[in-house]
Design a protein with these regions (language model features):
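N-terminal accessory/interface modules of nucleic-acid-binding and processing proteins
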Residues: 1-316
Length: 316
């Protein structure tokens, strides 16, 4: 089994702990405090102010969407081509070893309290709220291209996929169906009809209707991409955190296109064009760029969640 196959099989160790809601909230607050005081993390956040840095983060997010935002920024800053990351111990559990000359990627992770600290707490008879919970630290992880197999690894069986035009057409039909279903769930109707002029789609806030161009020269793949973009704009307006951001036309366009970029990649329909951040965006502080990225992550996550369940069968 290759490193990619091992990770895709659901065997990737996570750098982030699973916990209840109260612990997650505490963990988030602690992460924000630690990240604000850490030079490497701040460099990674500041990189979002440039078009190149923003694009690097979008590519990393498409591969590591389940990792927290701060860790996505760190990976994009240190190794933007990373696709699957795990600790050295994690890779060994999968049958791989990290090569000796490889530099680690530093990411935030919760390190559990030592056994001795927990034993001391028990012996002292201290109350539950004083139980040692561990610490938040920058820990080393490695990408899949930094490891080699331990011993002989069997070659994965290559599945034969039928080459037929109908397969691609069926995927597009399924994608459009999932998008239309999601739109109806948030109170938005979708209509396809010819549109005169250069505009290929639009959203009418007063009626809650999205209209997508159905002209013969606007193929189904382009219609799906435009529908994702229009839905992104709807969700941007609905997002509670959006009110804390002053989105001018340039900033809003970048956020919407970034969402469409991420969701398109999730649906297997990547976008080739680069996304250029506005001049004013680049002049703002890294904390503002962080809030833009968080908005993209939230909105894209909603659309990706709606699509994944319906598209998993098509991607197998």
């Amino acid at each position: 089994m290759s490193a990619v196959k091992a990770v895709q099989a659901g065997q990737r160790p996570s750098a982030m702990p699973s916990s209840n809601g109260r612990c997650r909230s505490k963990y988030k607050r602690e992460l924000l405090e630690r990240a604000a005081a850490d030079g490497l993390t701040q460099e990674a956040v500041e990189a979002l102010r440039s078009s190149d840095g923003w694009q690097r983060w979008l590519r990393v997010r498409c591969q590591l969407a389940t990792h927290g935002l701060h860790n996505q920024f760190l990976v994009a800053h240190q190794r933007p081509g990373a696709r699957h990351v795990a600790s050295q111990q994690g890779w060994r559990s999968l049958g791989y070893e990290v090569r000796s000359d490889e530099a680690p990627i530093r990411v935030w992770a919760h390190v559990p309290a030592s056994k001795s600290a927990v034993c001391d707490w028990r012996r002292a008879g201290s109350p539950p709220e004083e139980k040692p919970e561990g610490d938040l630290r920058l820990v080393p992880v490695f990408d899949q291209d930094q490891v080699s197999p331990l011993g002989e690894v069997p070659k994965p069986v290559q599945k034969k996929h039928p080459r037929s035009g109908s397969s691609e057409a069926n995927k597009l039909i399924r994608l459009l169906g999932q998008l239309i279903k999601f739109a109806s769930e948030i109170g938005v109707s979708v209509n396809f009809e010819p549109i005169a002029g250069v505009v290929r789609g639009y959203h009418e806030p007063g009626t809650g209707e999205i209209v997508i161009d159905a002209s013969p020269d606007f193929p189904p793949a382009a219609r799906a991409a435009r529908l994702i973009y229009e839905l992104a704009n709807v969700l941007i307006d609905e997002d509670p955190g959006r009110r804390r951001l002053k989105l001018c036309n340039g900033e809003r366009e970048v956020v919407a296109r970034s969402v469409a970029w991420c969701v398109g990649a999730c649906a297997g329909r990547g976008y080739a064009e680069a996304i250029v951040v506005p001049t004013q965006w680049a002049a703002d502080s890294g904390s503002v760029a962080f809030r833009y990225a968080a908005l993209v992550d939230r909105v894209a996550g909603r659309l990706e969640g709606a699509l994944l369940s319906g598209l998993e069968g098509e991607q197998e």
